[in-house]
Amino acid sequence: MPKAKGKTRRQKFGYNVNRKRLNRNARRKAAPRIECSHIRHAWDHTKSVRQNLAEMGLAMDPNKAVPLRKRKVKAMEVDTEERPKDLVRKPYVVNDLEAEASLPEKKGNTLSRDLIDYVHYMVENHGEDYKAMARDEKNYYQDTPKQIRNKINVYKRFYPTEWQVFVASLQNKKMEVD
């Protein structure tokens, strides 16, 4: 098969093109990624931001969304005509967002596995004797008795049910030994 005409010439580098400006302009013109999946799926790229949000029943400007009490106006100045409400064409977006917001927040902060193992080891071997814990060979960071007590209290606060189970298992072990 013959070569395509005009493809034998190699590409030459364009020295007169400012690559930094080219990339910056491309970044500016690119539409940002919408993080919220509900809004992203309902988004219409042919419409403006204001139109899209109005269709979803969301407010573009939070100051305009919440009506503020105006000063008292005399009866003659009052207009009987009110502004017509915007038509919400995509109410499911607001419903989904409200449902997502009403879910309980997932607990994201946990303790490291090393700290949990450290607390278990110290309490198993020394009970409530923090000075003995401070002298223990597994106390790699040379924590003071007060620091060790604070670490144990943090563990108790983070995992109260696990702490109760752990203490109960220690009591059972003590009973079996006696």
From Swiss-Prot:
UniProt keyword annotations, A-Z: Acetylation, Isopeptide bond, Nucleus, Phosphoprotein, Ubl conjugation
GO CC annotation, single: nucleolus
Pfam family, one: Nop16
Location of the region described as Disordered in the Swiss-Prot/TrEMBL record: 1-31
Disulfide pattern: none
InterPro entries: Ribosome_biogenesis_Nop16
UniProt superkingdom: Eukaryota
Residue(s) of cross-link: Glycyl lysine isopeptide (Lys-Gly) (interchain with G-Cter in SUMO2): 74
Residues recorded as bearing N6-acetyllysine in the entry: 90
UniProt-annotated location(s): Nucleus, Nucleolus
Biological process, per Gene Ontology: ribosomal large subunit biogenesis
Positions carrying Phosphothreonine: 8, 144
Family indicated by similarity: Belongs to the NOP16 family.
Protein name: Nucleolar protein 16
UniProt organism field: Rattus norvegicus (Rat)
